[in-house]
Structure formats: structure tokens, C-alpha cells
């Protein structure tokens, strides 16, 4: 694996790369809100055994530059597309998690002949504009990164390890730490600023998948987590995801191959909870391209 920092129109975007071979197509991995490229640390090494795989820190996240503006989905897509071109990723499979799935769907819609396939990982299909204010408030609460400012490094890691929805594994420490800065006094602060997070959330509130379905001309795989045993809120959101998946199968009329895969008893953070199973689904999507 190697890391890099590439300037795109005055904005430096950080990325990491796994290259185990020259099989086509390459893969672009897009993280979710408040996360970082490191969320793919358990997927990239497997996926990159035969091909080139790039995971990036999107605008305002991780080690990429921070900006006061440019956090609407289509600007984020332009950032990500420009980086893919700068790094020579020709017709990548674009994989997005959570908010990153919103970005991935928009990417495939805005550049329909610039991608080989798209994989939406527990995101991308829920019509946020159709939700009541009360329903949106619940989702917004779940999407927001917890306020960790002022915690020590050890306190932050202890909180991460105590999460009930995600079994702890040693690699999670570095993945979690990639989302924060450790100050000289030992306290931490989020890399994504609160104001930038609020701007992204406003963009998410306006997200309507149907705006992007019609132009998508590549295979689409939708991977969704079923954690409905967690609580009543999780069950309610599961119903929204089911509705969104059904609408996607209907709306993606130009897609030559579209399928929905459910992971039972799985946390929202699929790339770190079920990395092997997720990688298998991405590879299955790539295999369908070989059959065409």
C-alpha cells in the first residue's frame, strides 16, 4: 500500500492505493460522512490483490484540505472524478459507503460513460426529501459524528471499542484515529469541522435518488445492512431502505444489471464489520463485467 496527496484545482486530496496486479477495471472507494479513506483498510488489501484500488479522503475529511464551501454532492463528485482522472483510473468501479453511496450514485449519473459499475453500500437509495421533519431528525442524529472534542486519545479509543453495534477488532483503532487530530495537549478534535458537517447534512437532506437513476448506464449493486434487531429506530430505517431499494430497481432502467444484496445482523459500517463478504460482492459485480 502507498499513500499520496494530489492537488485538484487548488484542493489537495489524500488517497491510499493497493496494487497487486493490472486486472481491469480499477476500483475507486468512497467513504461516508465524517469518515476517512482508512474505513477501507480491511477491504482494499483483498480487493487489490489483482487490480488497482484507490481510496480517497474527500473534501474536508481525513488528510485532505479543508474548505469553507463546496460540500454539495455534485461538487464532491467533481472532486472525486478529477482525482480519479489525475491518478489514471480509467472506467473505475465506484464503490461508496453511506453518504459516499449518495456520491457514488451521483458520480455514475453525472459521468455515465466514465464508470464500469457502481456499488452502493448501505446508502444511496433513501429519498431524504420525502421524509417528515421528525423522521429526518432521527436520521440526522444517527448520521452526525459524536462530539469527541476535548477527549483524550485513550478516552476516544475506549468509546470506540465500547460500541455495541460493531465488534471490536485491533484494526479499528487506526481507522477511528484517522478521523481526528491529536492536539499538543493530548486532546482530540474531529478532522471534519462541525460547520462542514452541517453543510453536508443540508445537502443530504435534499438528496433524492430518483434525480440520478435515469442517466445511470452501468451495472449497479446495492448492498444493505439489516440490523433490524437493534432497536425500533433501526427497524423503521430498514423499511425506508427497503422502499429505496425497490424504487432503485424500478428507476435504474438503463442499467444492464442491477441487484440488491442484504447482509443480515450487520452494522451500518459494513466495510469494517463484514469486509470479506463486501469484497466478495464487489468482485461479483466485476465478474458480471467480464461476462458482458
Task: Name these PLM-found stretches.
Residues 39-41, 64-70, 129-132, 233:
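Conserved catalytic-core motifs of eukaryotic protein kinase domains, centered on the activation segment
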Residues 11-63:
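Conserved HGGG/HGGXW glycine-rich cap/lid loop of the alpha/beta-hydrolase fold
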Residues 123, 127-214:
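Helix-rich cap/lid subdomain of alpha/beta-hydrolase
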Residues 8-11, 16-18, 54, 58-99, ...:
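Active-site loop/oxyanion-hole signature of alpha/beta-hydrolase fold enzymes
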Residues 263-275:
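Catalytic histidine-centered segment of alpha/beta-hydrolase-like enzymes
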Residues 183-254, 262:
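Conserved serine/cysteine hydrolase catalytic core
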